[in-house]
Amino acid sequence: MIQSQINRNIRLDLADAILLSKAKKDLSFAEIADGTGLAEAFVTEALLGQQALPADAARLVGAKLDLDEDSILLLQMIPLRGCIDDRIPTDPTMYRFYEMLQVYGTTLKALVHEKFGDGIISAINFKLDVKKVADPEGGECAVITLDGKYLPTKPF
């Protein structure tokens, strides 16, 4: 039976335990996701408390991380999503995304509405991918793909 969580702390505590086990075992998120049939980003999102994993995937990652049965069950429960505090992020990486939306948010909104009309980009029917690519000027760049279904506003 599908179960749901009403308290974000239990999943955040589990995420802390998962990250500790991941570090002790020297595993990458890609290695943990391997064999689940799910995207690395989706499995990572679940391990950090923002998604529910199917039972088979939860058992597989649970075995890789030496999680107990209760933790494996928690990974399958629908979480209380959106655990970022209602304040400006202080973590430098998360702040840069906040900053990007502050700078480019109105541009993204204008371009999306111009190309699609009034509506939103789904965060439910959504895919996320992060790639590291060489910068022709030296160093490396992050290519972040946000792929969400467009949902038009419907008058009623």
Curated annotation (Swiss-Prot):
It catalyses: cyanate + hydrogencarbonate + 3 H(+) = NH4(+) + 2 CO2. The active site is at residues 96, 99, 122. One of its GO terms (biological process) is cyanate metabolic process. Its EC number is 4.2.1.104. InterPro entries: Cyanase, Cyanate_lyase_C, Cyanate_lyase_C_sf, CYNS_N, Lambda_DNA-bd_dom_sf. Pfam families: Cyanate_lyase, CYNS_N. Keywords: Lyase. The keyword Hydrolase does not apply. Transmembrane segments: none annotated. GO terms for molecular function: cyanate hydratase activity; DNA binding. It comes from the Bacteria. The keyword Lyase applies. Belongs to the cyanase family. Catalyzes the reaction of cyanate with bicarbonate to produce ammonia and carbon dioxide. This is Cyanate hydratase. It comes from Escherichia coli (strain ATCC 8739 / DSM 1576 / NBRC 3972 / NCIMB 8545 / WDCM 00012 / Crooks). The gene is cynS.
